Amino acid sequence: MLSLLALAVAGPAAAQVWPVQREAEALAVDAAEVARTEGGTAEAALAELRAQGASVALTEWIEGAYRDRLAGLSLDTGGDVSVLLTGRKPVADMMAQAGEATVVVRFRTGAKATRDQLLAAIREHQAAIRAMLARPPAMGIDARRGELVIMIGGADAAGDREQLRKRIERLTDVPVRLAPADRPDGLLAGTAALDAPPSPLVGPVVPGGSQVMGPDPVNGRRYICTTGFAVSDGERTAIVTAAHCPDTLEHIATDGSRIPLPFVGQWGWGFQDVQVNLSPLADRAVFFADTARTQVRQVEHQRGRAATRVGDLVCHRGERSGYSCARVLMTDFAPSGDLCGGACLPMWVAVAGPSCRGGDSGGPIFIGTTAIGLLKGSSYRGDRSCGFYYYMPIDYLPEGWRLLTVPRP
């Protein structure tokens, strides 16, 4: 649910100036946040983040080489790769070079269904599974166990869970596990920087990771969301946020000044939740990552869903929750309810918090200076703390619009 924010009027203000982070500095900041959240040292976290980016080509090769048997692929803490295969024929572990890191690839066998079979089970039986339960559930694929995860709560969780699990398993003919709706427990078991530092960013500008506000046409209340990244259709520049945010939006700068953002369109069916609002001031490929919005990062790269692995570290900035980093839980996730103009497709990515709040919708998902996605929604525990959030991968931007990145040197 979006969060209500009181309307405030601000007068004119002087131009604002923000220092710009490049890739090396941005990764160091993210590594410090990972170390704070998970424990360990910032040095170890930084080494893992570098290996994470460098190992994408390796895991893409593994997925292609073992596609007929692949049940799941995930990253372990430290950056090693775990591969789960169907069948009993063993595959020897291997070591591979990923940038400066040596990555261990461990193979396990004995899974009962491939990833393709698990995805087909969601596509073919999602409606029937929803009909079995009091509330349409979220569902996704546990890449570590090779199981279809159905996330239930309330009356559904209070019933005969084992009988329900068996019913769904008979229907889908794949392994099924039921998990609490507020936490899918068990799922957690580039180019060189320029020699010269980037010039500071001088406002006014409409960056990603900042606040937008607009009225609900039905109840008249004003709601806040978070901007994602700057985009272009080749002629115009714009900023993206979530499609479920208000159509009519104003950008609220850190000094309180406001910039109208004319509405272009929204895409919110099945696998997308993205809205485009125009602004000539969204012509810089920059976004806020820090909670206080004191400095910006340039967008230097992008990484799509196919290159995202369970266990990857990603970060996000939300207008209400601020900045945090955590690990990917599922890359084949279908949110609960009818949040996608009906049932959602299993094409979203779920991340283990640790912070999310109403008003974060549309905010940037990133690591370092790499754009990864836009936050769609969150699941909360009974005490309203953040259980997990989920996002739309950046490669699902609407047709005709592309992500702005800094020019190559």
Model regions and ranges:
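Cleavable N-terminal signal peptides
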Residues: 2-3, 13
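Protease-domain processing segments flanking chymotrypsin-fold serine proteases, especially trypsin-like
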Residues: 15, 38-48, 116-141, 147-238, ...
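Extracytoplasmic low-complexity, Pro/Thr/Ser/Ala/Gly-rich segments
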Residues: 16-84, 196-219, 409
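Short glycine/threonine-rich beta-strand-turn micro-motifs
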Residues: 19-26, 32, 36, 46, ...
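Extracytoplasmic
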Residues: 68, 77-80, 100, 134, ...
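A mature extracytoplasmic/lumenal domain signature
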Residues: 77, 85-89, 109, 143-145, ...
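Terminal interaction modules at protein C-ends
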Residues: 187-409
